[in-house]
C-alpha cells in the first residue's frame, strides 16, 4: 500500500513538472519590437519599430517582434501559441495580428499569425519567409 502511494505521488510530480517549468509570458507589450534577449542595438530596434508602425498605418495589420534568449526546453509551437493568446496582437474583432518570434540561443524562429490573416499569410508562406528571407 505504501509503495502504491509512493508511485502515485511520483506520477503526480512528474505530470505537474512540465507546467511548472514553462517559460513565463511577458505582459502584453506597448512596443512593436520587444527584445528580451538584448540582441538588437537601440538603433536597430528603433528603426524596425518605425518600419512596423509605418506598415501598420498602411495595412491596418499589426506586426510585433519578440526576441528571447531561449525557450528553456519548451516547444516552440506551444510557447508561441501561449504568447499569442496572452498578447492578443491585432485589432479586436479582426484578429489581424502577427508575432515574429526569435529565440537566439536555440536558433529558432516562428511567425504566429492571427486567424484574420491566415488566408493571406498561410503557414506555408510564413515558413517560406523564414527559410528564404530571414534565415
Name the predicted role of every residue range:
Residues 1-5:
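Positively charged n-region of N-terminal signal peptides that target proteins for export
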Residues 6-17:
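Bacterial N-terminal signal peptides
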Residues 21-135:
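Folded, non-transmembrane soluble domains that reside on the lumenal/extracytoplasmic side of membranes
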Amino acid at each position: 500500500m505504501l509503495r502504491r502511494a509512493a508511485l502515485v505521488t511520483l506520477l503526480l510530480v512528474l505530470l505537474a513538472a512540465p507546467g511548472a517549468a514553462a517559460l513565463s509570458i511577458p505582459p502584453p507589450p506597448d512596443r512593436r519590437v520587444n527584445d528580451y534577449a538584448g540582441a538588437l542595438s537601440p538603433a536597430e530596434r528603433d528603426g524596425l519599430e518605425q518600419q512596423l508602425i509605418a506598415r501598420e498605418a498602411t495595412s491596418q495589420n499589426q506586426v510585433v517582434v519578440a526576441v528571447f534568449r531561449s525557450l528553456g526546453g519548451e516547444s516552440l509551437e506551444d510557447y508561441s501559441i501561449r504568447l499569442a493568446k496572452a498578447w492578443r496582437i491585432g485589432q479586436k474583432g479582426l484578429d489581424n495580428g502577427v508575432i515574429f518570434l526569435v529565440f537566439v540561443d536555440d536558433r529558432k524562429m516562428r511567425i504566429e499569425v492571427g486567424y484574420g490573416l491566415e488566408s493571406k499569410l498561410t503557414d506555408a508562406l510564413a515558413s517560406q519567409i523564414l527559410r528564404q528571407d530571414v534565415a
